[in-house]
Amino acid sequence: MPTGDYDSKPSWADQVEEEGIDVEPLSPQIKKQDPASFVLDTPREVINGNIKTITEYKLNDKDKKIKIVRTFKIETLKASKVVAHRKNWKKFGNSEYDPPGPNVATTTVSDDVLMTFITNKEDLNNQEEEDPMNKLKGQKIVSCRICKGDHWTTRCPYKDTLGPMQKELAEQLGLSTADKEKAPGAEPEPAQAPVSKTGKYVPPSLRDGGSRRGESMQPNRRADDNATIRVTNLSEDTRETDLQELFRPFGSISRIYLAKDKTTGQSKGFAFISFHRREDAARAIAGVSGFGYDHLILNVEWAKPSTN
């Protein structure tokens, strides 16, 4: 039986098994070449807009011809002159005949590293000038006449509740707080002694208050307890200034204590207000108890005297 060297063509079943990859037998000349140079045809490039498609044919491990299609997106980036000049260098070694651009077989492309140079010298000429508007951020430019907040009076959230109540109380009392302090029944302020401007030594007996008798703090504390009221059902956003504006129309206030949470700083819902006169405290209980304030109904009553 005669024999001869001939190339066997793959069957149709083998082509389907290779999932549609073009398969061609190897010629004897190709088999003698180095496997690293098994590039059958010159890669074909097709550029469509900013999409570049490269098609080439190579041999796999089974000595079969395969088709490789690579798609690239072209992006134009601005680079410095030094970088552009470095890209035009002539390649050498295994990449001597490579096209422009990196080759994954010989080149590893990593992320760009941005370098920041820090100098010890401070450039005083490039310091940013201070914005005069930043200085006014911490200052209170606008003050509300009703709640003393940092907004206009026409935009006060308590305009419909606190404003009418203050006007009604002022009409019932018939006097403003400033007029009440000037009334005949009010205690006159003690006259201040003239201050010596000569720089000479003044004995304690001749100084301001030296001729008066010392007063004990215990009677004043008892008087405060008798004219102290307790306000409950306050909102968490209540401040001392809100209580001052709410109870000031009834009389002179000596002390305000608002219970606050140590961690959050918000109100615990109750406070103590001490008046100079018990009559003012009684009017405050009658006027504010049951009053709606900040969507809550306030409860005002006499505070229990302390046992200390």
UniProtKB/Swiss-Prot annotation:
The protein's name: Eukaryotic translation initiation factor 3 subunit G-B
Residue stretches of biased makeup (Basic and acidic residues): 209-227
Functional summary from the UniProt entry: RNA-binding component of the eukaryotic translation initiation factor 3 (eIF-3) complex, which is involved in protein synthesis of a specialized repertoire of mRNAs and, together with other initiation factors, stimulates binding of mRNA and methionyl-tRNAi to the 40S ribosome. The eIF-3 complex specifically targets and initiates translation of a subset of mRNAs involved in cell proliferation. This subunit can bind 18S rRNA.
Domain RRM: 227-305
Signal peptide extent: none
Annotated region described as Disordered, given as residue ranges: 1-35, 176-227
Compartment list: Cytoplasm
Gene Ontology cellular component list: eukaryotic 43S preinitiation complex; eukaryotic 48S preinitiation complex; eukaryotic translation initiation factor 3 complex
One annotated GO molecular function: RNA binding
